[in-house]
Amino acid sequence: MLSNTLRSNFLKFYANRNHTPVASSPVFPHNDPSILFTNAGMNQFKNIFLGKEQTSYTRATTSQKCIRAGGKHNDLENVGHTSRHLTFFEMLGNFSFGDYFKQDAISFAWEVSLSIFNFDPDFIYATVHEKDDEAFALWEKYLPTDRIFRLTDKDNFWSMADTGPCGFCSELLFDRGEKFGKAASPLEDVDGERFLEYWNLVFMEFNRTSDGTLLALQKKCVDTGAGLERLVSLLAETETVFEADVLRHLISKIENLSGTTYSPTEAKGAAFRVIADHIRSLSFAIADGLLPGNTERGYVLRKILRRAVNYGKRLGFNRPFLADVVPSLVDVMGEAYPELSASVTQIQEVLTTEEEHFFKTLQRGGNLLQQVLKSSASSAKISGEDAFKLKDTYGLPIDEIALLAKDYNYAIDMDTFEKLEVEAKERSRKNTKKTKNDSDSVFQDLDPTNTSEFIGYDTLSCDTFIEGIIKYNEIASSLEEGDEGAIILRTTPFYAGKGGQIGDSGEIFCESGTFLVSHTIAPKAGLIVHLGKLSQGSLTTTMAVTAQVNQNLRKKTANNHTGCHLLHKALEMTLGEHIRQAGSYVDSQKIRLDFTHNKALSPEDLLAIETLVNEKIRENDPVTIREVLYSDVMSSSEIKQFFGDKYGDIVRVVSAGFSHELCGGTHAQATGDIGYFRITKEHAVATGIRRIEATTGEDAENIAREQDVDLNEIATVIQSPKDQILVKIRSVMEEKKDLAKQVADLENQLVQQQVKTLLTSCEKICDTSYLVYYLTEEEGQRIQHYANAIHKEIPTNFISLWITEKNGRYIVLSRVSDDLTKRGVQAHTLLAELLAPYGGRCGGKAISAQGSSAELPQIEFLNKTLRQWISTQLA
């Protein structure tokens, strides 16, 4: 594959020029709610650009997985209908963090364009910002001035946000020739098809203040991005990105599955392009730990899947098919992205489950569509509200709705539809926009040099100094008795909550006062904050203090954390290698582990998992911790890493018996320290995600003791030895079942006897028999039995109405024989008209309906009303 060669050569080029190759971050940022998806190579370096994080390197190069399908950058609706829009793409990039600037960035880009991309220099053009004389002069070394263009802020100024780092940018374009347009220069190429942009170089040299002032940055940075798919298309000289390399390989697989040949110019061509693109977004997102859902990123992922399914229908796919395309994707991208290969089973299971669910939804949507078409008949126009509901709820694209409307010669109220679209996007924007509370803000406002050294792996107590105090969400210099606040220490043994493990609690004290630490957090890189309350005395900044972690709680938390690792490995060994951690929480009392699995665990599964963990505890293996290069870990299949997480150059490997994981948390010294492991609960938390809750040590033993006490009480109540409890309970259940059958038989006999009497009470009109009967509250418990029995006796031309009372309301059941429903007589219509005057409500079908009402007239009036209704219906 050309893309594999280009990617590899690009990264090698920059690695040979002292750039550190950095692995792609996940397609969705775990710690940045300001964006839905990773949409550029610079996303993972955002805090470095902002000066909030330090790194061991000043130059980096990446091939970043990106998704543009939500928020500010949303290409979803264009995919399949243009030559180059994609929801998933790879962005090649090189970065400088206060190292080189424009001269080297431009020099590197020119060399790569010629030696790696093999572009003819006579067809390369550049744009610069109209005020960027430096960049213009640098490009003059490589290009004639008539192929360098000055553009405005709109095209050549980049900013991360309204305030903060920003700067001029320079774009590289390639002239694809007159075949793609008659424009003589990029300025005339309105749609950008002939002069195709292939690389953007961003020069971050300013810091924009809230009033718009541009101040010079102390550290100037470079951020570049080149779309790999676009480069491949240029080199392969294809008209669109879909005719080359990976995407064409996927289209070939779709051709094979559908039995339909792809033609770029035919209407069905869009379906091939949509599926080929969307399967990449879906697969990489699931591999990185995201699942389809009803909110935020999960909702966008579900929209992508449903869009792919809808386009698949145009190719004849009327059953789940996306999972069948996944192996072809892994064949061509699995080597570059091992997380894809490791997650094949999980990806396929999630896709199939979602597709099955959506096909059922589409059946309901099809019914709704027919209702919409029927209700629109008089105006020959589908309302904007209905069109939006079909698109938003059932995933029917607006162009598909438009085609259906065209078949009926209907118009669509597009003004209302587009208004609702805008409102929905605004709601989505507000939901995903990062909200900063006051406490977040005050932490960000702290001096960047105000950091803490964590020494808590080796000790639980140390003498240190107070570096900072926060009180009432403001930076302060002291805390007085009773004050709640936060303390920052120069060095600290307190573990800050992260990676699923709760932060430490304990005390910070000196002769002047004692601060009770309730929780410890790390609001930003390098900063450890101790939250709590001053129980006595006073404390001020710069004071010498002692920091003491609660030893008992730390030990129990550490044991639980190691137990969580053993549980994770036991799940994988018991259920299969598709198991992946989807979240965890560990404190001193419990373990909570979320994992990918599509069905509930059987009692046998849970017993096997619990037994395996306890076996490893009894083996009392030492828990070893070592720091290694992340590059070494990437080549090891033994060490469990979480592909959705971001790691530094040096990582911490925790080994406990058969478990080996990357982890920054605290752990037991040996597996035997855990003592005993007990699963307390297993349940679903989302589609494809299960959760196990467990505990260890004394807490687990207490649960076992409590259950033993319960067993003793049960044995006493049912008068059985403990070892015979199950036999006795089964015997009692069988007796109960037999008694229930006897009761049911007696009730049926009672109903049958009463029905024989009721047959003589039936009246007749229009050759149709009918009955109105009031049941006592006790009889009303068998209201369906009565209706079934009498309609069995009178199977045709018969309508019955049954009334009883329950909880102060009237319960009404209407039944209509099947032959009458074919003549237009509907049970739910009868009941709705009958209850409407009294504020009642009902539901049901043509043959049977049930409702309730606080009021009803006398039975004689109901009898008369039913008689009149039948006469009207069958006249």
Swiss-Prot record:
Its cofactor is Zn(2+). Binds 1 zinc ion per subunit. Gene3D superfamilies: 2.40.30.130, 3.10.310.40, 3.30.54.20, 6.10.250.550, Bira Bifunctional Protein, Domain 2, Threonyl-trna Synthetase, Chain A, domain 2. It is found in: Cytoplasm. Zn(2+) binds at residues 561, 565, 663, 667. Keywords: Aminoacyl-tRNA synthetase, ATP-binding, Cytoplasm, Ligase, Metal-binding, Nucleotide-binding, Protein biosynthesis, RNA-binding, tRNA-binding, Zinc. Its EC number is 6.1.1.7. It catalyses: tRNA(Ala) + L-alanine + ATP = L-alanyl-tRNA(Ala) + AMP + diphosphate. GO terms for cellular component: cytosol. Its main location: cytoplasm. Belongs to the class-II aminoacyl-tRNA synthetase family. Catalyzes the attachment of alanine to tRNA(Ala) in a two-step reaction: alanine is first activated by ATP to form Ala-AMP and then transferred to the acceptor end of tRNA(Ala). Also edits incorrectly charged Ser-tRNA(Ala) and Gly-tRNA(Ala) via its editing domain. Consists of three domains; the N-terminal catalytic domain, the editing domain and the C-terminal C-Ala domain. The editing domain removes incorrectly charged amino acids, while the C-Ala domain, along with tRNA(Ala), serves as a bridge to cooperatively bring together the editing and aminoacylation centers thus stimulating deacylation of misacylated tRNAs. This is Alanine--tRNA ligase. It comes from Chlamydia trachomatis serovar D (strain ATCC VR-885 / DSM 19411 / UW-3/Cx).
